[in-house]
UniProtKB/Swiss-Prot annotation:
This is Disease resistance protein ADR1. GO terms for biological process: defense response to bacterium; plant-type hypersensitive response; response to other organism; response to water deprivation. ATP binds at residues 193-200. The gene is ADR1. Disease resistance (R) protein that mediates resistance against Hyaloperonospora parasitica in a salicylic acid-dependent manner. Also mediates resistance against Erysiphe cichoracearum is both salicylic acid-dependent and partially NPR1-dependent. Resistance proteins guard the plant against pathogens that contain an appropriate avirulence protein via an indirect interaction with this avirulence protein. That triggers a defense system including the hypersensitive response, which restricts the pathogen growth. The LRR repeats probably act as specificity determinant of pathogen recognition. Pfam families: NB-ARC (PF00931), RPW8 (PF05659). Residues 247-414 form the NB-ARC domain. Induction: Accumulates in leaves 1.5 hours postinfiltration of Pseudomonas syringae. It comes from the Eukaryota.
């Protein structure tokens, strides 16, 4: 038998592919078979070439088997030549088509058996050699480390800490991979299971799995679809991923798919690739769907004990039977075990007894998984302070799968529940400790000066569903929270049916598309204090019934579309005398004039990704008369903001944040008018070239952030007059030096800067000994693209 390289020297696969392409284009009766053969041979061709050019010496057995494969391909080549020699309408085409079918079966059998055996054999061969090399390397490294006395080091790996839970995850991965490797011709696979069962965790682990990434040559895309998908964004991501110029098998993982319609729409964009759909429903063929298994009793016991006792089993004096009863009632659901375990942490046995009794009154185990989860979750909430519980329920007003700005969340709670910001912050920590929300990691979270800028929280879908479920138990007109669970083109029909009677809701949340005058119907909301308007469009007519919401204290208008929306109907603001907080995102801000209705109680304004145009340029009137009580102004990612002249006429300002505004060149000289200003953030304003000397006349200023102001090269000479200044953040600035007056900053306690600037501050530290100089690590992120 000739060697493998000799057999394939003529590259028979390339010749055969050309002939098959001609057959597919010219002989109708053989078209389908030829196309299938083309696919099969193209898939195996890279492997053949890899072996051919690797220089490896194959065993006699492997050469014999590959010789058989060569003979099959040679038969196929000769058959193609016969087919092409026949006239177009020759009856022999039928005979040739049957012959091609036989060859197709032979090739398929060979690829499904022999090739896999060869790979396994070579892997075993390499593994033996690799193990020997690894042992030799270990010995050499040990000898080297001993001679140099290297200190012991530790690497932290983000993984599941409990081996039993990790085993469950590995089992799920194994079963999904078995499906993928078995049904190679299938384009749709599924992971299905009840809420909180670990579907997403399993999907994420699969996306990182070496075997999966090897199968798809690292071409794996993970997308979260959600109940109200943004198809424009999702389809854009899919297009960029699939049409990257690389023609190979690819995997798209669609997580949190709610409906068949959503899947069908996205699948129409993923033709020719493999899709793994992750859903509460079974959307793929049962043969290619993995149903996530709930935890077994010992695994569930381990997870609950880790959350409640920080160990894998109950402590010896504790009543193990009580723990077992709680585990039994959780029915193996990981999310339920985790939340309930956290709620029971550090609680005495008597408290556990009460929880067990309440759990036993719940519904017995059955197919209705969501209701069981809600029942367990609600038991976990019973131990919360009533106001914290209400704050948890308020989170149902925000869209699913979206990061919630902490500043927005606390503003809602402050105005809704008459608490201060410090208390609202403690509520966030309390809910986070109970695993009822997640604080998105931010290294500066909790800093007393920074406040809540750039800090977000998220909430699991099941927990949000629980909040909606609990809020909707009473009649629609009696609900304290009137919430739309997902985006709809119009308001709910249930609301329209009951519009003749006033609604008692104090929080109203609407999720719609573009709305005009005809889309709204009248609603009487005399008790409403918070209104959240989420929409996606370029034009949006504000609901006329806002004008009757005389108690409204918080108004949030968020456009989730691609470009800023034009709002219509601003005349309704004339009746919002009690409005205290206004949050606008991705909209055109109306121009302020001397005729603008004053908002005398407005304390907070947030403008995010807005077009502000001339809103803050006018000097012909006193802007402080429109906002006489404004204490907190945030302008972020507003790329058309040019001047701030009128802003510094607002003498009541306590906090001013101008961030990511690329066209701001300078601050106005009337800056010193804002005598009560304590926090000044000018983060990432790359064209800002200087700070006016008037900034030194602010007696209450405690915090200054000029980080990423790359054009700023100096501080005012009299900067040392800021006797109340406690903290400066100046990372990624281009300062050439510090004024000598900074030695007089007796209250300064914290400076964040780059390595190059730190030496300047070391000189200041000699006269301000309590000064802490923090050298910042450079951090590049595009998280803001998610907003």
């Amino acid at each position: 038998m000739a060697s493998f390289i000799d057999l394939f020297a003529g590259d028979i696969t390339t010749q055969l592919l050309k002939l098959l392409a001609l057959v597919a284009n010219t002989v109708y009766s053989c078209k389908g078979i030829a196309e299938r053969l083309i696919t099969m041979i193209r898939d195996v061709q890279p492997t053949i070439r890899e072996i051919q050019y690797s220089g490896a010496e194959l065993s006699n057995h492997h050469q014999t088997q590959l010789g058989v494969f060569y003979e099959i391909l040679e038969k196929a080549r000769k058959l193609c030549e016969k087919v092409l020699r026949c006239n177009r309408w020759n009856l022999k085409h039928v005979y040739h088509a049957n012959k091609m079918k036989d060859l197709e079966k032979q090739i398929s059998r060979f690829l499904n058996s022999q090739i896999l055996l060869f790979v396994l054999a070579e892997v075993c061969h390499l593994r033996v050699n690799g193990d020997r090399i690894e042992r030799n390397m270990d010995r050499l490294l040990t000898e080297r480390n001993d001679s140099l006395s290297f200190p012991e080091t530790m690497m932290e790996i983000e993984t599941v800490s409990d081996p039993e839970i990790q085993t469950v995850l590995e089992l799920g991965k194994k079963k999904v991979k078995e499906m993928m490797f078995k049904f190679t011709d299938t384009h749709l696979f599924g992971i299905s299971g009840m809420s909180g069962s670990g579907k997403t965790t399993l999907a994420i682990e699969l996306s990182k799995d070496d075997d999966v990434r090897g199968l798809f040559k690292n071409k794996v895309l993970f997308l979260t679809v959600s109940r109200s998908p943004n198809f424009e964004n999702l389809e854009s991501c899919i297009r960029e991923f699939l049409y990257d110029g690389v023609h190979q098998r690819k995997l798209v993982i669609l997580d949190d798919v709610w409906t068949r319609e959503s899947l069908d729409r996205l699948m129409s964009k993923i033709r020719g690739s493999t899709t793994l759909v992750v859903s509460r429903s079974k959307l793929a063929d049962p043969r290619t769907t993995y149903n996530v298994e709930l935890l077994k009793k010992d695994e569930a016991m381990s997870l609950l004990c880790l959350c409640a006792f920080e160990q894998k089993s109950p402590p010896s004096p504790f009543n193990k039977y009580l723990v077992k009863q709680v585990v039994d009632e959780c029915k193996g659901l990981p999310l339920s075990l985790k939340v309930l375990g956290a709620s029971l942490k550090n609680k005495p046995e008597r408290y556990w007894e009460g929880v067990v009794k309440r759990l036993l009154r719940g519904e017995a185990a059955d197919e209705t998984h969501e209701s069981r989860v809600f029942a367990h979750m609600e038991e976990s909430l019973e131990n919360l302070d009533p106001k914290i519980r209400d704050c948890f329920l308020d989170m149902g007003a925000f869209p699913e799968d979206k990061k919630i700005p902490l500043d927005l969340l606390t503003s809602v709670w402050v105005e809704r529940h008459d608490i201060d910001e410090e208390t609202a912050f403690s509520f966030v920590l309390r809910l986070a400790d109970k695993n009822l929300l997640t604080i998105v990691n931010n290294p500066r979270f909790g800093d007393v000066h920074i406040g809540y800028y750039d800090v977000f929280v998220t909430q699991h879908d099941v927990l949000r569903d629980l909040a909606l479920h609990m809020s909707n138990r009473v009649d629609v007109n009696r609900r304290e929270r009137l919430l739309m669970p997902k985006t709809e083109p119009v308001l709910p029909r249930e609301w329209e049916k009951n519009k003749d009677e006033p609604f008692d809701a104090k929080i109203v949340s609407l999720h719609t598309g573009e709305m005009d005058e005809m889309n709204w119907f009248d609603m009487d909301l005399p008790k409403a204090e918070v209104l959240i308007l989420n929409f996606s469009s370029d034009n949006y007519v504000l609901p006329p019934f806002i004008g009757k919401m005389s108690r409204l204290r918080v108004l949030v208008i968020i456009n989730n579309g691609m470009s800023p929306a034009r709002l219509h109907g601003f005349s309704i603001f004339a009746n919002l005398a009690k409005l205290r907080s206004l949050w606008l995102k991705r909209v055109h801000v109306p121009e302020l004039t001397s005729c603008t209705i004053p908002l005398k109680n407005l304390h907070k304004i947030h403008l995010i990704f807005c077009k502000v145009k001339n809103s803050f340029v006018q000097t012909s009137f006193d802007i402080s008369k429109i906002f006489p009580s404004l204490s907190d102004l945030t302008i972020d990612h507003c790329d058309d903001l040019l001047e701030l002249k009128s802003i510094f006429g607002i003498t009541s300002l306590n906090s001013l944040s101008i961030t990511n505004c690329p066209r701001i060149l300078e601050l106005p000289k009337n800056l010193s008018n804002v005598q009560s200003l304590e926090r000044l953030r000018l983060y990432a304003c790359p064209e800002l070239i200087s700070l006016p000397v008037e900034v030194c006349e602010l007696p209450c200023l405690k915090y200054v952030d000029i980080s990423q102001c790359v054009s700023l090269v100096s501080l005012p000479e009299k900067f040392g007059k800021l006797g109340s200044l406690e903290k400066i953040d100046m990372r990624e600035c281009s300062l050439l030096g510090l004024p000598s007056s900074v030695a007089a900053l007796v209250s300064l306690r914290h400076v964040i800067c780059d390595e190059e600037t730190s030496s300047m501050w070391e000189m200041v530290k000699k006269v301000v000994p309590e000064l802490c100089i923090e050298v910042a690590k450079k951090c590049f992120t595009v998280d803001w693209l998610d907003d």
